[in-house]
Structures are given as structure tokens and as C-alpha cells.
Amino acid sequence: MSTSTDADVALRLGRVRERVAAACAAADRSPASVLVIGVTKTHPPALAREAVAAGLMDLGENRVQELLAKMPRVDGARWHLVGRLQRNKAKDVVGRQVLVHSLDRPRLADALSRRAAELETLQRALVQVNVGDDPAKGGCTVDEARDLVAYARELPYLAVEGLMTIPPLPGPGGDPGASSRPHFARLRRLRDELREEFPEVVHLSMGMSADLEAAVAEGATMIRIGTAVFGPRGRGPWRPQED
């Protein structure tokens, strides 16, 4: 269970915004070009509500079950699913205005589009790419990305708007930013190549608490921040009885 307080969240969020502003200045970018997503994994809705009150309107979750439990408890937020999505859980996400960051295979694209068709809605998604070829991370390979984007865009109720990646962890004592930056650069190059054929592939969801500066330098349009806003994670997923 989280031990952060409301005051901690507002203070930490301010520090994150300062880091983003400094990184954008160094990259000759506007801070408005980078969307900060607060990842509330394991943290209670009370802290998510405080983040929204402090102006952090975009929130992310790794698990579908935790996402669905928190959504009705946090007014005014825009939600993102940033963790792996099982095909049988697709029906639980579609129709809730959730941006899925983890589209990684054609069968999942089919499941999302099929459910969206039933609800007569459009499901937005990002294709997750395993740019570091890390077996511990999800996502399609760089070589598979083009075909997956092409496949998904033919589905009438699915809109692919960009790419997402999670780079490999640095080695012991390594600098997260220096370790991650080549992978962020690779995703940016892939996005640029895909945009020539698929102009709607705009967004780059990359960068977390430890390496957001490197992500901004390489063109991230979305960064996923957990610990730097909400403090250390709890030992397990948040449960409704803990609110």
C-alpha cells in the first residue's frame, strides 16, 4: 500500500514539470508538446484524485482490473492502459475512452476492433515495439512494426496513433538516461519512417521517471511517470477495500 500523501503528490508533480521544462528547453521544444501521464500502479485512488486536482489529467494503469476499479473513483481523468493487454480482456477496455499503449499483435488488434464495432465506437491505440529486443519486455519487433500498423489501420474501428516502447534496464550502476537514449532514438527513427506511409502515426510514448530527459531529447510526445509523482510503489496491486 502506498505511503505517499496528497502534499507529496503535488510537490513531486511540480518537480517533474520542472524537469520536463528543462529537458524541453535543452531540446528546443515546447513543454506543451510533451504529455505527462501519471502511472498510478499500486497507488490508491485518493492520490490519483490529488494528482488530477494538481492538474495532472492523464493517468495510466498497468493492469486492466486495477484500471477498471479506479476509473469510477477518479473524476475528470483521461485514462491510459500502459501494461500488456490480454486478448480476453480487450472487451473490458473498449468503450471507456482508454488509450491502449500496448497493441503488439494482430489478434489483439482484431479483438479490440471487434468489440469496438459492437459498441459502434473507435478504439485508439499505440503499437508497442520492443526496440531493445529484450525478452523481459513486451512488444512486437522493429521488423514486425510496419506490418502490424498496416494490418491495424485496415480495421475500421481501430485507430493507431503512434508507438510505445520500454527500453531494457541499464546494467548495475548504469545511467538510465544514457542506457535508454539509443532505444528512444531507434523508436523515433521508426516512427519517422512509418509516418511517410502512415501519417497518423504521430505519438511516441517513451520515457519514465529515471530517463524522461533522454526521452524528451529524442522526441517523446508522451512520458509515463510513476515513482517521480506518486512515490515508491506498494507491494502489490491496489484493492478497492484499501481506499
Walk through the language-model features, giving the residues of each.
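Active-site loop ensemble at the mouth of alpha/beta enzyme cores that anchors a bound cofactor
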Residues: G236-D243
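Glycine/alanine-rich phosphate-binding loops at beta-alpha junctions
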Residues: T227
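Conserved acetyl-CoA-binding loop of GNAT-fold acetyltransferases
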Residues: G219-I223
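Conserved alpha/beta-domain cores
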Residues: M1-A210, V216-E218, F230-R235
